[in-house]
Structures are given as structure tokens and as C-alpha cells.
Amino acid sequence: MRFQRAAVILRIKGDTKPLQVETFRFVQLQADSAYEQGLAHIRAGRVKPRLSDSEALGNYIDRQVRTRLREQYSNLGIDTSGSGPVRVNRRENISSENETTYRRPDARVDKIAFDVTLTEKTLKTAQIRGFFDTDFRPSHVVIIRPRQLGGRYSYIITRPEMNR
């Protein structure tokens, strides 16, 4: 219901803040669920790791979360495939370098990037610095880890210039 309301607010008022909150809530629940499912699939031999079980689990979680988030947005009439403010697993260009490169956050809602991960990340992590270098210049990167991992499972990294 809250997610629906956030979608209506986006359509009518153009305000992305409620959708940012609901995206976080939804992605956290999906990451938790996909973590349990992924572990069960690995134990049953239905997911074959290339390098490690951890890599296979992370890839499984990413795919599941992105698929479910796309479906959720689609069911609410929110386009995630174009160049709009809501995107799922889309290239975000970095054109400030000599040649254009890109980063691919799991999701983006306006100026917030979302990254689902098994590992803790900081501003020193190349991927996070890369997100901040993208042309859409996010104000924050939300790190979402399955709660089953314990500790700091979800947190926000603020753009460095905004801390001043």
C-alpha cells in the first residue's frame, strides 16, 4: 500500500522521496528473501558456483532482487528502462573522463543509488566512488545487505562534498 502511494505521489507531484523510502524497504525484504533462497539452492546443487559459493550467492541475490524490483515498478506503472529518474540495473555514464565509462547500480531513484551486496563497502571502495562520479551525481548510495549477515546490514554513504 505504501509503495502504491509512493508511485501515485511520483506521478502526480513528481516527488521521488516517498519512492526512495519504499524502494529501500522493498529491496531490503527482497535481499533477505533471496539470501535464504540462494543458500537453499546452493546446498541443493541448483546453483553452480564458478569461483566460490559466496560469488554464486551474490549473483543469485542480485538477479532476484532486480527482477522483483522491476516487476514491482512495472505493476505500479513506473518505467525503469529509459532515461528517467527511476532505473533498475542501467548504465550510468561517467563522461568526465577522457573516454566515457559507466557504473551500473542495482537501482536508482532520482539522486539515490542502491547497491545490494554481501560485502561491506565504504567511500574508499572503487565501485562506490564510481557511483558518485556518474553523470547523475547521486547525493547518496544506499548499501543494502541481507539482514542475516548481522552487523551493519544496511547503511547510507553520503556524497563527500555534502558532508561539509
Residue ranges of model-derived segments:
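Catalytic toxin/effector domains delivered as secreted proteins or via bacterial secretion systems
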Residues: 3-164
